[in-house]
């Protein structure tokens, strides 16, 4: 603590007699580039990317086959859209009430 108290009265730049502005190397604008690291030891073999070679010839598992059968109509990816079949599948008593509500919502737009 006493060493800090003595140096606090004098700024470090004036004590050394060197202005801080001139740096040993002028830096360029933007993000500094990453320093190249020298390889140490054996280089590790790169692992192949993507699908393994023989994976397409295998038959799907039983769980995957059940899942494929369980899913009905295949829908496209992305934002879910309203499909007209959903309205047809509902009970006739509910359809009448939905038709009136759908007409009201159409008038609001």
From Swiss-Prot:
GO cellular component entries: male germ cell nucleus; nuclear chromosome; nucleoplasm; nucleus; protein-DNA complex; senescence-associated heterochromatin focus; SMAD protein complex
Transmembrane segments annotated in the record for this chain: none
UniProt-listed GO biological process terms: adrenal gland development; astrocyte differentiation; base-excision repair; cell division; cell proliferation in forebrain; chondrocyte differentiation; chondrocyte proliferation; chromatin organization
This protein's record includes keyword Cell cycle: yes
Composition-biased stretches (Basic and acidic residues): 66-75
Composition-biased stretches (Low complexity): 15-25
Annotated region (Disordered), positions in chain: 1-109
Basic residues compositional bias, start-end: 46-56
Gene Ontology MF terms in the entry: 5'-deoxyribose-5-phosphate lyase activity; C2H2 zinc finger domain binding; cAMP response element binding; DNA binding, bending; DNA-(apurinic or apyrimidinic site) endonuclease activity; enzyme binding; MH1 domain binding; MH2 domain binding
Annotated region of DNA binding: 24-34, 44-54, 71-82
SMART domains per record: AT_hook
Main location: nucleus
InterPro entries according to UniProt: AT_hook_DNA-bd_motif, HMGA, HMGI/Y_DNA-bd_CS
Residues modified as Phosphothreonine: 40
Compartments reported by the entry: Nucleus
Chain segments carrying region Interaction with E4F1: 44-63
Comp. bias regions, Acidic residues: 95-109
Pfam families: AT_hook
Residue positions, PTM Phosphoserine: 44, 101, 105
Alphabetical keyword list: Acetylation, Cell cycle, Cell division, Chromosomal rearrangement, Disease variant, DNA condensation, DNA-binding, Dwarfism, Growth regulation, Mitosis, Nucleus, Phosphoprotein, Proto-oncogene, Repeat, Transcription, Transcription regulation
N-acetylserine: residues bearing it: 2
Family recorded in the similarity comment: Belongs to the HMGA family.
Function in brief: Functions as a transcriptional regulator. Functions in cell cycle regulation through CCNA2. Plays an important role in chromosome condensation during the meiotic G2/M transition of spermatocytes. Plays a role in postnatal myogenesis, is involved in satellite cell activation. Positively regulates IGF2 expression through PLAG1 and in a PLAG1-independent manner.
Subunit structure: Interacts with E4F1. Interacts with NEK2.
Name of the protein in its database record: High mobility group protein HMGI-C
Origin species: Homo sapiens (Human)
Lineage of source species: Eukaryota, Metazoa, Chordata, Craniata, Vertebrata
